[in-house]
Amino acid sequence: MGGLEKKKYERGSATNYITRNKARKKLQLSLADFRRLCILKGIYPHEPKHKKKVNKGSTAARTFYLIKDIRFLLHEPIVNKFREYKVFVRKLRKAYGKSEWNTVERLKDNKPNYKLDHIIKERYPTFIDALRDLDDALSMCFLFSTFPRTGKCHVQTIQLCRRLTVEFMHYIIAARALRKVFLSIKGIYYQAEVLGQPIVWITPYAFSHDHPTDVDYRVMATFTEFYTTLLGFVNFRLYQLLNLHYPPKLEGQAQAEAKAGEGTYALDSESCMEKLAALSASLARVVVPATEEEAEVDEFPTDGEMSAQEEDRRKELEAQEKHKKLFEGLKFFLNREVPREALAFIIRSFGGEVSWDKSLCIGATYDVTDSRITHQIVDRPGQQTSVIGRCYVQPQWVFDSVNARLLLPVAEYFSGVQLPPHLSPFVTEKEGDYVPPEKLKLLALQRGEDPGNLNESEEEEEEDDNNEGDGDEEGENEEEEEDAEAGSEKEEEARLAALEEQRMEGKKPRVMAGTLKLEDKQRLAQEEESEAKRLAIMMMKKREKYLYQKIMFGKRRKIREANKLAEKRKAHDEAVRSEKKAKKARPE
Protein backbone atom coordinates (compact mmCIF):
# COMPACT_ATOMS: atom_id res chain seq x y z
CA MET A 1 0.00 0.00 0.00
CA GLY A 2 1.61 3.27 -1.07
CA GLY A 3 0.72 6.88 -1.56
CA LEU A 4 -0.15 8.67 -4.74
CA GLU A 5 1.76 7.56 -7.80
CA LYS A 6 4.31 10.17 -8.87
CA LYS A 7 5.10 10.96 -12.45
CA LYS A 8 8.45 10.15 -13.98
CA TYR A 9 11.36 12.58 -13.30
CA GLU A 10 9.55 14.15 -10.31
CA ARG A 11 11.71 12.63 -7.59
CA GLY A 12 15.29 11.61 -6.97
CA SER A 13 18.21 13.22 -8.77
CA ALA A 14 15.93 14.87 -11.35
CA THR A 15 14.66 17.29 -8.70
CA ASN A 16 18.15 18.24 -7.43
CA TYR A 17 19.35 19.91 -10.64
CA ILE A 18 18.18 22.75 -12.86
CA THR A 19 19.32 23.76 -16.32
CA ARG A 20 21.10 27.05 -16.92
CA ASN A 21 18.27 28.57 -18.96
CA LYS A 22 15.67 27.75 -16.31
CA ALA A 23 17.91 29.18 -13.59
CA ARG A 24 18.46 32.35 -15.62
CA LYS A 25 14.72 32.82 -16.15
CA LYS A 26 14.04 32.19 -12.48
CA LEU A 27 16.48 34.97 -11.54
CA GLN A 28 15.24 37.21 -14.41
CA LEU A 29 18.79 37.90 -15.59
CA SER A 30 20.53 37.91 -18.94
CA LEU A 31 23.13 35.25 -19.67
CA ALA A 32 26.02 37.69 -19.15
CA ASP A 33 24.63 38.88 -15.79
CA PHE A 34 23.92 35.31 -14.68
CA ARG A 35 27.48 34.26 -15.50
CA ARG A 36 28.81 37.32 -13.68
CA LEU A 37 26.69 36.60 -10.60
CA CYS A 38 27.85 32.97 -10.47
CA ILE A 39 31.51 34.04 -10.67
CA LEU A 40 31.13 36.56 -7.86
CA LYS A 41 29.23 34.15 -5.60
CA GLY A 42 31.40 31.12 -6.36
CA ILE A 43 28.59 29.05 -7.92
CA TYR A 44 29.72 26.59 -10.57
CA PRO A 45 27.96 23.96 -12.77
CA HIS A 46 27.68 20.34 -11.68
CA GLU A 47 27.76 17.20 -13.77
CA PRO A 48 24.97 14.80 -12.66
CA LYS A 49 25.81 11.17 -12.12
CA HIS A 50 22.88 10.03 -14.27
CA LYS A 51 22.61 12.78 -16.84
CA LYS A 52 19.82 11.11 -18.81
CA LYS A 53 17.55 10.90 -15.76
CA VAL A 54 18.14 14.54 -14.85
CA ASN A 55 17.62 15.61 -18.48
CA LYS A 56 14.25 13.79 -18.59
CA GLY A 57 15.43 11.12 -20.96
CA SER A 58 17.15 13.49 -23.38
CA THR A 59 20.82 13.17 -24.29
CA ALA A 60 21.23 16.80 -25.43
CA ALA A 61 24.21 18.69 -24.04
CA ARG A 62 23.06 20.99 -21.25
CA THR A 63 24.63 22.80 -18.32
CA PHE A 64 23.20 21.91 -14.90
CA TYR A 65 23.31 23.72 -11.57
CA LEU A 66 22.22 22.54 -8.16
CA ILE A 67 18.73 23.82 -7.35
CA LYS A 68 19.84 24.77 -3.82
CA ASP A 69 22.55 27.05 -5.27
CA ILE A 70 20.00 28.88 -7.42
CA ARG A 71 17.69 29.31 -4.42
CA PHE A 72 20.68 30.73 -2.57
CA LEU A 73 21.17 33.31 -5.36
CA LEU A 74 17.55 34.47 -5.13
CA HIS A 75 18.32 36.35 -1.90
CA GLU A 76 21.44 38.12 -3.22
CA PRO A 77 21.10 41.95 -3.12
CA ILE A 78 23.41 42.35 -6.14
CA VAL A 79 20.65 40.88 -8.34
CA ASN A 80 18.57 44.02 -7.76
CA LYS A 81 21.60 46.16 -8.63
CA PHE A 82 21.95 44.30 -11.93
CA ARG A 83 18.32 45.08 -12.72
CA GLU A 84 18.79 48.73 -11.74
CA TYR A 85 21.82 48.95 -13.99
CA LYS A 86 19.79 47.54 -16.88
CA VAL A 87 17.19 50.29 -16.36
CA PHE A 88 19.98 52.88 -16.08
CA VAL A 89 21.46 51.86 -19.45
CA ARG A 90 18.03 52.05 -21.09
CA LYS A 91 17.37 55.55 -19.70
CA LEU A 92 20.87 56.73 -20.64
CA ARG A 93 20.47 55.50 -24.21
CA LYS A 94 17.12 57.27 -24.45
CA ALA A 95 18.59 60.54 -23.10
CA TYR A 96 21.47 60.38 -25.59
CA GLY A 97 18.99 59.81 -28.40
CA LYS A 98 17.00 62.90 -27.42
CA SER A 99 20.19 64.96 -26.80
CA GLU A 100 19.07 65.75 -23.26
CA TRP A 101 22.53 66.45 -21.86
CA ASN A 102 21.33 67.58 -18.45
CA THR A 103 19.53 64.28 -18.05
CA VAL A 104 22.65 62.43 -19.17
CA GLU A 105 24.76 64.16 -16.51
CA ARG A 106 22.13 63.52 -13.84
CA LEU A 107 21.89 59.85 -14.75
CA LYS A 108 25.69 59.44 -14.69
CA ASP A 109 25.85 61.04 -11.26
CA ASN A 110 23.23 58.58 -9.99
CA LYS A 111 24.73 55.52 -11.65
CA PRO A 112 23.89 52.39 -9.59
CA ASN A 113 26.95 50.91 -7.88
CA TYR A 114 27.43 47.86 -5.69
CA LYS A 115 30.05 46.56 -3.28
CA LEU A 116 31.40 43.05 -2.86
CA ASP A 117 32.34 43.38 0.82
CA HIS A 118 29.51 41.15 2.05
CA ILE A 119 30.41 38.47 -0.54
CA ILE A 120 34.05 38.45 0.61
CA LYS A 121 32.97 37.98 4.24
CA GLU A 122 30.49 35.31 3.20
CA ARG A 123 32.94 33.27 1.10
CA TYR A 124 35.88 33.64 3.50
CA PRO A 125 34.71 33.48 7.13
CA THR A 126 38.29 33.61 8.47
CA PHE A 127 41.44 35.38 7.32
CA ILE A 128 43.27 32.08 6.82
CA ASP A 129 40.57 31.00 4.34
CA ALA A 130 41.25 34.15 2.32
CA LEU A 131 45.01 33.48 2.34
CA ARG A 132 44.49 29.92 1.11
CA ASP A 133 42.55 31.23 -1.90
CA LEU A 134 44.98 34.05 -2.69
CA ASP A 135 47.02 32.22 -5.37
CA ASP A 136 44.62 32.85 -8.26
CA ALA A 137 43.88 36.39 -7.07
CA LEU A 138 47.55 37.36 -7.14
CA SER A 139 48.21 35.71 -10.51
CA MET A 140 45.23 37.47 -12.11
CA CYS A 141 46.07 40.88 -10.60
CA PHE A 142 49.73 40.63 -11.67
CA LEU A 143 48.58 39.72 -15.19
CA PHE A 144 46.16 42.66 -15.44
CA SER A 145 48.74 45.06 -14.00
CA THR A 146 50.96 44.43 -17.05
CA PHE A 147 48.21 45.03 -19.64
CA PRO A 148 48.59 48.06 -21.93
CA ARG A 149 45.97 50.78 -21.75
CA THR A 150 43.81 49.64 -24.65
CA GLY A 151 40.09 49.21 -25.14
CA LYS A 152 40.20 45.59 -23.97
CA CYS A 153 40.24 46.49 -20.27
CA HIS A 154 39.30 49.54 -18.22
CA VAL A 155 42.23 51.76 -17.32
CA GLN A 156 40.97 52.03 -13.74
CA THR A 157 41.11 48.24 -13.37
CA ILE A 158 44.70 48.11 -14.65
CA GLN A 159 45.78 50.90 -12.28
CA LEU A 160 44.00 49.27 -9.33
CA CYS A 161 45.70 45.91 -10.02
CA ARG A 162 49.08 47.62 -10.24
CA ARG A 163 48.55 49.43 -6.94
CA LEU A 164 47.41 46.29 -5.09
CA THR A 165 50.26 44.13 -6.40
CA VAL A 166 52.86 46.76 -5.43
CA GLU A 167 51.34 46.91 -1.94
CA PHE A 168 51.54 43.11 -1.63
CA MET A 169 55.17 43.04 -2.79
CA HIS A 170 56.04 45.68 -0.20
CA TYR A 171 54.46 43.51 2.50
CA ILE A 172 56.52 40.49 1.36
CA ILE A 173 59.67 42.66 1.53
CA ALA A 174 58.83 43.99 5.00
CA ALA A 175 57.90 40.56 6.39
CA ARG A 176 60.79 38.70 4.64
CA ALA A 177 58.18 36.14 3.59
CA LEU A 178 59.60 35.07 0.19
CA ARG A 179 60.78 31.45 0.05
CA LYS A 180 61.19 30.18 -3.54
CA VAL A 181 61.57 31.61 -7.05
CA PHE A 182 61.50 29.80 -10.38
CA LEU A 183 61.95 31.10 -13.93
CA SER A 184 59.72 29.23 -16.39
CA ILE A 185 58.50 29.73 -19.94
CA LYS A 186 55.15 31.04 -18.66
CA GLY A 187 56.63 33.58 -16.26
CA ILE A 188 58.27 33.87 -12.85
CA TYR A 189 56.84 31.69 -10.08
CA TYR A 190 57.10 32.96 -6.51
CA GLN A 191 56.31 31.19 -3.25
CA ALA A 192 55.83 33.14 -0.03
CA GLU A 193 54.85 31.99 3.45
CA VAL A 194 52.26 34.30 5.03
CA LEU A 195 51.06 33.39 8.54
CA GLY A 196 52.13 29.80 7.96
CA GLN A 197 50.23 29.50 4.65
CA PRO A 198 52.26 28.87 1.45
CA ILE A 199 51.13 31.19 -1.36
CA VAL A 200 52.30 30.59 -4.94
CA TRP A 201 51.68 33.02 -7.79
CA ILE A 202 53.07 33.72 -11.25
CA THR A 203 54.02 37.05 -12.80
CA PRO A 204 54.43 37.48 -16.58
CA TYR A 205 57.64 38.72 -18.13
CA ALA A 206 57.80 42.38 -19.15
CA PHE A 207 57.16 41.84 -22.85
CA SER A 208 54.78 43.70 -25.15
CA HIS A 209 51.26 42.27 -25.16
CA ASP A 210 49.42 40.93 -28.18
CA HIS A 211 45.87 40.37 -26.97
CA PRO A 212 44.53 37.04 -28.29
CA THR A 213 41.09 37.12 -29.89
CA ASP A 214 39.88 33.80 -28.46
CA VAL A 215 39.90 35.02 -24.83
CA ASP A 216 36.71 36.31 -23.18
CA TYR A 217 37.96 39.44 -21.42
CA ARG A 218 34.57 40.08 -19.82
CA VAL A 219 34.84 36.86 -17.81
CA MET A 220 38.43 37.72 -16.83
CA ALA A 221 37.32 41.23 -15.84
CA THR A 222 34.60 39.77 -13.59
CA PHE A 223 37.13 37.54 -11.83
CA THR A 224 39.48 40.53 -11.49
CA GLU A 225 36.69 42.63 -9.98
CA PHE A 226 36.24 40.03 -7.25
CA TYR A 227 39.97 39.42 -6.77
CA THR A 228 40.83 43.12 -6.41
CA THR A 229 38.29 43.44 -3.59
CA LEU A 230 39.71 40.34 -1.89
CA LEU A 231 43.32 41.52 -2.27
CA GLY A 232 42.42 44.94 -0.88
CA PHE A 233 41.02 43.35 2.30
CA VAL A 234 44.04 41.06 2.63
CA ASN A 235 46.57 43.87 2.13
CA PHE A 236 44.86 46.02 4.76
CA ARG A 237 44.96 43.21 7.33
CA LEU A 238 48.57 42.27 6.55
CA TYR A 239 49.75 45.87 6.86
CA GLN A 240 47.99 46.14 10.21
CA LEU A 241 49.82 43.05 11.48
CA LEU A 242 53.20 44.70 10.76
CA ASN A 243 52.13 48.16 12.05
CA LEU A 244 52.55 49.68 8.58
CA HIS A 245 50.58 52.62 7.22
CA TYR A 246 47.80 51.65 4.85
CA PRO A 247 47.66 52.88 2.13
CA PRO A 248 51.46 52.63 2.25
CA LYS A 249 53.60 55.63 3.01
CA LEU A 250 57.29 55.93 2.14
CA GLU A 251 59.75 56.11 5.01
CA GLY A 252 61.92 59.22 5.35
CA GLN A 253 59.77 61.60 3.31
CA ALA A 254 60.77 65.24 3.55
CA GLN A 255 58.90 67.24 6.17
CA ALA A 256 57.89 69.83 3.61
CA GLU A 257 56.46 67.15 1.35
CA ALA A 258 54.66 65.55 4.27
CA LYS A 259 53.14 68.88 5.33
CA ALA A 260 52.15 69.76 1.79
CA GLY A 261 50.41 66.44 1.41
CA GLU A 262 48.97 66.29 4.91
CA GLY A 263 45.95 64.04 4.98
CA THR A 264 47.01 62.31 1.77
CA TYR A 265 48.91 59.08 1.28
CA ALA A 266 51.72 57.98 -0.97
CA LEU A 267 49.54 56.50 -3.70
CA ASP A 268 47.55 59.70 -4.22
CA SER A 269 50.10 61.07 -6.69
CA GLU A 270 51.68 59.43 -9.70
CA SER A 271 55.24 60.27 -8.65
CA CYS A 272 54.79 58.63 -5.24
CA MET A 273 53.27 55.60 -6.95
CA GLU A 274 56.36 55.30 -9.13
CA LYS A 275 58.60 55.57 -6.08
CA LEU A 276 56.63 52.81 -4.38
CA ALA A 277 56.73 50.63 -7.50
CA ALA A 278 60.53 50.97 -7.58
CA LEU A 279 60.66 48.75 -4.43
CA SER A 280 63.91 50.40 -3.32
CA ALA A 281 62.60 52.33 -0.29
CA SER A 282 61.15 51.03 2.98
CA LEU A 283 57.64 51.79 4.20
CA ALA A 284 56.77 53.99 7.16
CA ARG A 285 55.51 52.26 10.28
CA VAL A 286 52.84 53.37 12.71
CA VAL A 287 54.37 54.51 16.01
CA VAL A 288 53.32 52.03 18.68
CA PRO A 289 54.03 52.17 22.42
CA ALA A 290 56.97 50.09 23.59
CA THR A 291 55.81 46.74 24.88
CA GLU A 292 57.29 44.87 27.78
CA GLU A 293 59.64 42.02 27.09
CA GLU A 294 57.94 38.69 26.85
CA ALA A 295 58.51 36.32 29.72
CA GLU A 296 60.57 33.27 28.89
CA VAL A 297 58.62 30.05 28.75
CA ASP A 298 59.72 27.40 31.21
CA GLU A 299 61.10 24.28 29.59
CA PHE A 300 59.90 21.03 31.11
CA PRO A 301 61.62 17.69 30.62
CA THR A 302 60.12 15.64 27.80
CA ASP A 303 60.63 12.16 26.44
CA GLY A 304 63.20 11.38 23.76
CA GLU A 305 60.83 11.44 20.79
CA MET A 306 59.33 14.82 21.71
CA SER A 307 62.75 16.33 22.37
CA ALA A 308 63.98 15.10 18.96
CA GLN A 309 60.99 16.75 17.28
CA GLU A 310 61.60 19.98 19.15
CA GLU A 311 65.28 19.90 18.16
CA ASP A 312 64.38 19.39 14.48
CA ARG A 313 61.88 22.24 14.66
CA ARG A 314 64.46 24.51 16.29
CA LYS A 315 67.02 23.73 13.58
CA GLU A 316 64.43 24.39 10.88
CA LEU A 317 63.55 27.77 12.40
CA GLU A 318 67.23 28.70 12.63
CA ALA A 319 67.75 27.78 8.97
CA GLN A 320 64.69 29.81 8.03
CA GLU A 321 65.94 32.88 9.90
CA LYS A 322 69.32 32.51 8.21
CA HIS A 323 67.59 32.23 4.83
CA LYS A 324 65.70 35.50 5.46
CA LYS A 325 69.05 37.32 5.86
CA LEU A 326 70.66 35.77 2.78
CA PHE A 327 71.64 39.05 1.08
CA GLU A 328 72.04 41.12 4.24
CA GLY A 329 75.10 43.36 4.04
CA LEU A 330 75.36 43.04 0.23
CA LYS A 331 74.87 45.93 -2.19
CA PHE A 332 73.69 45.19 -5.73
CA PHE A 333 73.68 47.31 -8.86
CA LEU A 334 71.43 46.33 -11.77
CA ASN A 335 72.42 46.97 -15.36
CA ARG A 336 69.89 48.14 -17.92
CA GLU A 337 69.44 44.76 -19.64
CA VAL A 338 68.34 42.75 -16.57
CA PRO A 339 64.73 42.43 -15.26
CA ARG A 340 64.75 45.27 -12.73
CA GLU A 341 61.50 44.74 -10.81
CA ALA A 342 61.90 40.98 -10.24
CA LEU A 343 65.52 41.30 -9.07
CA ALA A 344 64.79 44.32 -6.87
CA PHE A 345 61.86 42.47 -5.26
CA ILE A 346 63.94 39.34 -4.54
CA ILE A 347 67.04 41.16 -3.29
CA ARG A 348 65.03 43.43 -0.98
CA SER A 349 63.04 40.43 0.32
CA PHE A 350 66.26 38.87 1.62
CA GLY A 351 67.77 41.97 3.21
CA GLY A 352 69.97 43.26 0.40
CA GLU A 353 70.29 46.79 -0.97
CA VAL A 354 69.69 47.41 -4.66
CA SER A 355 69.98 50.32 -7.07
CA TRP A 356 70.21 51.06 -10.80
CA ASP A 357 70.95 53.86 -13.22
CA LYS A 358 68.96 57.02 -12.45
CA SER A 359 68.04 57.43 -16.12
CA LEU A 360 66.51 53.94 -16.18
CA CYS A 361 63.82 54.33 -13.53
CA ILE A 362 62.89 56.47 -10.56
CA GLY A 363 63.96 55.25 -7.12
CA ALA A 364 67.72 54.74 -7.57
CA THR A 365 69.50 55.08 -4.21
CA TYR A 366 73.19 55.05 -5.27
CA ASP A 367 75.26 55.24 -8.44
CA VAL A 368 77.37 52.64 -10.24
CA THR A 369 80.53 54.37 -8.99
CA ASP A 370 79.71 53.56 -5.35
CA SER A 371 82.69 51.69 -3.88
CA ARG A 372 80.48 49.72 -1.47
CA ILE A 373 78.78 47.74 -4.28
CA THR A 374 79.57 44.03 -3.85
CA HIS A 375 77.67 42.53 -6.81
CA GLN A 376 76.76 43.94 -10.21
CA ILE A 377 74.10 42.06 -12.17
CA VAL A 378 74.94 42.02 -15.88
CA ASP A 379 73.64 40.12 -18.88
CA ARG A 380 75.91 41.40 -21.67
CA PRO A 381 79.56 40.33 -21.57
CA GLY A 382 82.32 42.87 -22.10
CA GLN A 383 80.16 45.99 -21.89
CA GLN A 384 81.64 47.62 -18.80
CA THR A 385 85.00 48.25 -17.18
CA SER A 386 85.61 45.93 -14.25
CA VAL A 387 86.02 47.31 -10.74
CA ILE A 388 88.30 45.50 -8.30
CA GLY A 389 86.44 43.88 -5.41
CA ARG A 390 83.11 43.67 -7.26
CA CYS A 391 81.51 40.46 -8.55
CA TYR A 392 79.95 40.65 -12.02
CA VAL A 393 77.33 37.90 -12.13
CA GLN A 394 74.39 36.99 -14.34
CA PRO A 395 70.81 37.31 -12.99
CA GLN A 396 70.39 33.55 -12.53
CA TRP A 397 72.84 33.64 -9.61
CA VAL A 398 70.29 35.57 -7.52
CA PHE A 399 67.47 33.09 -8.26
CA ASP A 400 69.62 29.99 -7.71
CA SER A 401 71.05 31.36 -4.45
CA VAL A 402 67.54 31.97 -3.10
CA ASN A 403 66.44 28.43 -3.95
CA ALA A 404 69.67 26.90 -2.57
CA ARG A 405 69.31 28.91 0.70
CA LEU A 406 72.98 29.93 0.47
CA LEU A 407 75.26 32.17 -1.55
CA LEU A 408 76.44 29.96 -4.40
CA PRO A 409 79.99 30.22 -5.81
CA VAL A 410 80.00 33.02 -8.39
CA ALA A 411 82.52 31.34 -10.72
CA GLU A 412 79.77 29.51 -12.64
CA TYR A 413 77.73 32.71 -13.08
CA PHE A 414 80.36 35.15 -14.35
CA SER A 415 79.52 37.34 -17.32
CA GLY A 416 79.78 35.37 -20.58
CA VAL A 417 80.03 31.96 -18.86
CA GLN A 418 77.61 29.20 -19.88
CA LEU A 419 75.11 28.97 -17.03
CA PRO A 420 74.30 25.76 -15.13
CA PRO A 421 70.74 24.37 -15.40
CA HIS A 422 68.10 26.33 -13.46
CA LEU A 423 66.58 23.67 -11.16
CA SER A 424 62.98 23.94 -9.98
CA PRO A 425 62.66 24.35 -6.18
CA PHE A 426 59.11 22.96 -6.32
CA VAL A 427 60.34 19.42 -7.18
CA THR A 428 61.24 17.10 -4.31
CA GLU A 429 62.84 13.82 -5.31
CA LYS A 430 61.62 10.68 -3.58
CA GLU A 431 63.35 7.34 -3.16
CA GLY A 432 64.01 5.77 -6.54
CA ASP A 433 63.59 9.01 -8.52
CA TYR A 434 66.24 10.34 -10.87
CA VAL A 435 68.37 13.05 -9.26
CA PRO A 436 70.41 15.17 -11.70
CA PRO A 437 74.11 15.67 -10.94
CA GLU A 438 73.56 19.41 -10.41
CA LYS A 439 71.05 18.65 -7.65
CA LEU A 440 73.52 16.26 -5.99
CA LYS A 441 76.17 18.97 -6.10
CA LEU A 442 73.73 21.47 -4.59
CA LEU A 443 72.81 19.06 -1.78
CA ALA A 444 76.50 18.58 -1.03
CA LEU A 445 76.96 22.36 -0.80
CA GLN A 446 73.98 22.62 1.56
CA ARG A 447 75.54 19.97 3.82
CA GLY A 448 78.77 21.98 3.86
CA GLU A 449 80.70 19.40 1.85
CA ASP A 450 83.06 20.09 -1.04
CA PRO A 451 81.53 18.74 -4.28
CA GLY A 452 85.07 18.10 -5.52
CA ASN A 453 84.57 19.22 -9.09
CA LEU A 454 87.41 18.41 -11.42
CA ASN A 455 88.31 20.18 -14.60
CA GLU A 456 86.69 18.74 -17.68
CA SER A 457 90.00 17.77 -19.21
CA GLU A 458 91.00 15.89 -16.08
CA GLU A 459 87.59 14.22 -16.00
CA GLU A 460 87.96 13.08 -19.59
CA GLU A 461 91.48 11.75 -19.02
CA GLU A 462 90.43 9.98 -15.86
CA GLU A 463 87.40 8.48 -17.59
CA ASP A 464 89.54 7.23 -20.47
CA ASP A 465 92.08 5.76 -18.03
CA ASN A 466 89.33 4.29 -15.91
CA ASN A 467 87.65 2.74 -18.93
CA GLU A 468 90.91 1.10 -20.02
CA GLY A 469 91.78 0.09 -16.45
CA ASP A 470 88.30 -1.24 -15.83
CA GLY A 471 88.49 -3.38 -18.95
CA ASP A 472 91.85 -4.90 -17.91
CA GLU A 473 90.73 -5.44 -14.32
CA GLU A 474 87.47 -7.04 -15.41
CA GLY A 475 89.35 -9.43 -17.70
CA GLU A 476 91.85 -10.36 -14.97
CA ASN A 477 89.09 -10.84 -12.40
CA GLU A 478 87.12 -13.09 -14.75
CA GLU A 479 90.22 -15.20 -15.49
CA GLU A 480 91.02 -15.52 -11.78
CA GLU A 481 87.46 -16.56 -10.98
CA GLU A 482 87.47 -19.17 -13.77
CA ASP A 483 90.84 -20.58 -12.58
CA ALA A 484 89.62 -20.73 -8.98
CA GLU A 485 86.42 -22.52 -10.00
CA ALA A 486 88.33 -24.99 -12.17
CA GLY A 487 90.87 -25.69 -9.36
CA SER A 488 88.16 -26.28 -6.75
CA GLU A 489 86.31 -28.67 -9.09
CA LYS A 490 89.51 -30.67 -9.72
CA GLU A 491 90.26 -30.90 -5.97
CA GLU A 492 86.72 -32.14 -5.26
CA GLU A 493 86.95 -34.77 -8.03
CA ALA A 494 90.35 -36.00 -6.72
CA ARG A 495 89.01 -36.28 -3.15
CA LEU A 496 85.93 -38.24 -4.27
CA ALA A 497 88.09 -40.54 -6.43
CA ALA A 498 90.42 -41.29 -3.46
CA LEU A 499 87.44 -42.12 -1.19
CA GLU A 500 85.96 -44.46 -3.81
CA GLU A 501 89.31 -46.23 -4.23
CA GLN A 502 89.62 -46.77 -0.47
CA ARG A 503 86.10 -48.20 -0.32
CA MET A 504 86.83 -50.65 -3.13
CA GLU A 505 90.05 -51.81 -1.43
CA GLY A 506 88.22 -52.32 1.87
CA LYS A 507 90.32 -49.90 3.74
CA LYS A 508 88.91 -47.72 6.47
CA PRO A 509 88.34 -44.17 5.35
CA ARG A 510 90.74 -41.72 6.86
CA VAL A 511 90.44 -38.04 7.44
CA MET A 512 92.08 -35.92 4.77
CA ALA A 513 93.15 -32.32 5.05
CA GLY A 514 90.66 -29.94 3.44
CA THR A 515 90.34 -26.24 2.77
CA LEU A 516 88.50 -23.87 5.11
CA LYS A 517 85.44 -22.26 3.52
CA LEU A 518 84.31 -19.02 5.15
CA GLU A 519 80.57 -18.30 5.02
CA ASP A 520 79.47 -14.91 3.79
CA LYS A 521 77.19 -13.73 6.63
CA GLN A 522 75.86 -10.81 4.63
CA ARG A 523 74.88 -13.07 1.74
CA LEU A 524 73.23 -15.55 4.11
CA ALA A 525 71.24 -12.75 5.75
CA GLN A 526 70.08 -11.54 2.34
CA GLU A 527 69.04 -15.06 1.37
CA GLU A 528 67.09 -15.49 4.61
CA GLU A 529 65.41 -12.13 4.12
CA SER A 530 64.42 -12.93 0.53
CA GLU A 531 63.12 -16.34 1.60
CA ALA A 532 61.03 -14.78 4.39
CA LYS A 533 59.67 -12.23 1.91
CA ARG A 534 58.75 -14.97 -0.57
CA LEU A 535 56.94 -16.94 2.14
CA ALA A 536 55.10 -13.80 3.28
CA ILE A 537 53.90 -13.17 -0.28
CA MET A 538 52.72 -16.79 -0.52
CA MET A 539 50.66 -16.36 2.68
CA MET A 540 48.90 -13.21 1.39
CA LYS A 541 45.24 -13.17 0.47
CA LYS A 542 44.32 -12.77 -3.17
CA ARG A 543 43.30 -9.11 -2.82
CA GLU A 544 46.40 -8.24 -0.78
CA LYS A 545 48.63 -10.01 -3.29
CA TYR A 546 47.02 -8.07 -6.16
CA LEU A 547 47.58 -4.78 -4.33
CA TYR A 548 51.19 -5.73 -3.54
CA GLN A 549 51.83 -6.56 -7.20
CA LYS A 550 50.45 -3.18 -8.26
CA ILE A 551 52.73 -1.40 -5.76
CA MET A 552 55.78 -3.32 -6.95
CA PHE A 553 54.85 -2.65 -10.59
CA GLY A 554 54.74 1.09 -9.84
CA LYS A 555 58.14 0.93 -8.14
CA ARG A 556 59.67 -0.97 -11.06
CA ARG A 557 58.21 1.53 -13.52
CA LYS A 558 59.67 4.43 -11.52
CA ILE A 559 63.09 2.73 -11.53
CA ARG A 560 62.85 2.18 -15.30
CA GLU A 561 62.00 5.85 -15.86
CA ALA A 562 64.88 6.95 -13.62
CA ASN A 563 67.29 4.67 -15.51
CA LYS A 564 66.02 6.03 -18.81
CA LEU A 565 66.66 9.61 -17.66
CA ALA A 566 70.12 8.64 -16.41
CA GLU A 567 70.94 7.09 -19.81
CA LYS A 568 69.73 10.22 -21.60
CA ARG A 569 71.88 12.39 -19.35
CA LYS A 570 74.88 10.13 -19.96
CA ALA A 571 74.38 10.32 -23.72
CA HIS A 572 74.06 14.11 -23.52
CA ASP A 573 77.26 14.44 -21.48
CA GLU A 574 79.13 12.19 -23.90
CA ALA A 575 77.92 14.29 -26.84
CA VAL A 576 79.08 17.48 -25.12
CA ARG A 577 82.48 15.95 -24.35
CA SER A 578 82.97 14.72 -27.92
CA GLU A 579 82.01 18.16 -29.24
CA LYS A 580 84.56 19.82 -26.97
CA LYS A 581 87.23 17.31 -28.01
CA ALA A 582 86.48 18.05 -31.65
CA LYS A 583 86.80 21.78 -31.00
CA LYS A 584 90.16 21.26 -29.27
CA ALA A 585 91.45 19.03 -32.06
CA ARG A 586 90.29 21.44 -34.78
CA PRO A 587 93.23 23.56 -36.04
CA GLU A 588 92.75 27.31 -35.66
From Swiss-Prot:
Gene Ontology biological process terms in this record: cell population proliferation; maturation of 5.8S rRNA from tricistronic rRNA transcript (SSU-rRNA, 5.8S rRNA, LSU-rRNA); maturation of LSU-rRNA from tricistronic rRNA transcript (SSU-rRNA, 5.8S rRNA, LSU-rRNA); regulation of cell cycle; ribosomal large subunit biogenesis; rRNA processing
Any one GO CC term of the record: nucleolus
Q: Main location per UniProt?
A: nucleus
Q: Where is the composition biased (Acidic residues)?
A: 456-486
All residue ranges annotated as the BRCT domain in the record? 322-415
Region Required for 28S ribosomal RNA processing, annotated ranges: 1-54, 539-588
| Quaternary data | Component of the PeBoW complex, composed of BOP1, PES1 and WDR12. The complex is held together by BOP1, which interacts with PES1 via its N-terminal domain and with WDR12 via a high-affinity interaction between the seven-bladed beta-propeller domains of the 2 proteins. The PeBoW complex associates with the 66S pre-ribosome. The PeBoW complex also associates with DDX27, PES1 interacts directly with DDX27. Interacts with IRS1 and UBTF. May interact with MAP1B.
What protein am I looking at? Pescadillo homolog
Source organism = Homo sapiens
